[in-house]
Amino acid sequence: MATERKSRTKRAKKEETTWQERVIQIRRVSKVVKGGKKLSFRAIVVVGNERGQVGVGVGKASDVIGAVKKGVADGKKHLIDIPITKSNSIPHPIDGVGGGAKVIMRPAAPGTGVIAGGAVRTVLELAGVRNVLAKQLGSNNPLNNARAAVNALSTLRTLSEVAEDRGIPIQNLYI
């Protein structure tokens, strides 16, 4: 029984090491209270395993390290799974909205790379997408752009999912 427990904890630690995290922004924010201003830090963090799972998290704490840790935990709570094609791209063109930000993504040929800016680039890289074209419109806010990218990626569907929804075999999908 003790060995069972030991092996479970080792496996959990092994899974932990596969996650990568990148800090998009650290901002010092203040709250006005009776005694003056109370300073704290807000960290926006993207967490992904580069194999189709990614999440965006926000953490606030009185120190930077605490804010980043909370952001990583929040990102792991809000993970999404995305389908990635054999050419390490997305299956079809999509767009997503988060706040005032709009993100447009299109699949790209192998060797193109990730052509995107700012927070959207970070989200796509940590999701494991290697060939994609993306454009962010409407806002330069990193949090809204990251959330718009995650919203867009969450709407991706594979050919088999589309065929199943329509109730037809995959061979008859484009006939």
Curated annotation (Swiss-Prot):
GO biological process, one term: translation
Single GO term (MF): rRNA binding
Pfam assignment, any one: Ribosomal_S5
GO cellular component: small ribosomal subunit
Keyword Ribonucleoprotein appears in the UniProt entry: yes
SUPFAM superfamilies: dsRNA-binding domain-like, Ribosomal protein S5 domain 2-like
S5 DRBM domain: residues covered: 19-82
Keyword list, A-Z: Ribonucleoprotein, Ribosomal protein, RNA-binding, rRNA-binding
Presence of the UniProt keyword Transit peptide in the record: no
Assembly mode: Part of the 30S ribosomal subunit. Contacts proteins S4 and S8.
The record's note on its domains: The N-terminal domain interacts with the head of the 30S subunit; the C-terminal domain interacts with the body and contacts protein S4. The interaction surface between S4 and S5 is involved in control of translational fidelity.
Protein family (similarity comment): Belongs to the universal ribosomal protein uS5 family.
Function in brief: With S4 and S12 plays an important role in translational accuracy. Located at the back of the 30S subunit body where it stabilizes the conformation of the head with respect to the body.
Protein name: Small ribosomal subunit protein uS5
Upper classification of the organism: Bacteria, Bacillati, Cyanobacteriota, Cyanophyceae, Nostocales
